[in-house]
């Protein structure tokens, strides 16, 4: 007897907390890259009733007004930004991670191939829709 397999998915609207957080983090990344194409952004966003929390590591040569980015997104998706407290807990990328991103271990050990010159802070393959 063959076992049935089911695939499921979830679709949410732009005001849903998961979608809202994705849009905010994407907008923060876009803002950083507009000002500095070499920006490094590892940004997490959490939304709950009346609160948005942005945390992570951002290295950008220009100042980004993260609270303004968050409030613009809230307005764009139909929320009143004045009804939210926005907390930002962001710092620059750690030197340990920057060292791995700036120059791969293989490169530091003498490998001169082009792909060994590329560094990475962390690696993963993900897919999804925001």
Segment roles from a protein language model:
Residues 1-130:
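A domain-level signal for the structural core that forms small-molecule/cofactor-binding pockets
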């Amino acid at each position: 007897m063959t076992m049935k397999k089911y695939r499921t998915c979830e679709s949410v609207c732009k005001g849903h907390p998961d979608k809202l957080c994705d849009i905010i983090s994407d907008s923060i990344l876009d803002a950083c890259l507009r000002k500095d194409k070499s920006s490094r952004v590892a940004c997490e966003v959490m939304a709950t009733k009346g609160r948005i929390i942005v945390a992570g590591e951002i290295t950008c040569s220009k100042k980004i007004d993260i609270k303004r980015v968050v409030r613009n997104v809230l307005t764009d998706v139909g929320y009143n930004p004045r009804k939210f407290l926005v907390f930002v807990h962001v710092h620059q990328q750690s030197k340990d991670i920057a060292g791995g991103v700036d120059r791969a271990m293989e490169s530091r050990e003498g490998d001169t191939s082009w792909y060994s010159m590329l560094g990475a802070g962390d690696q993963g393959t993900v897919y999804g829709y925001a």
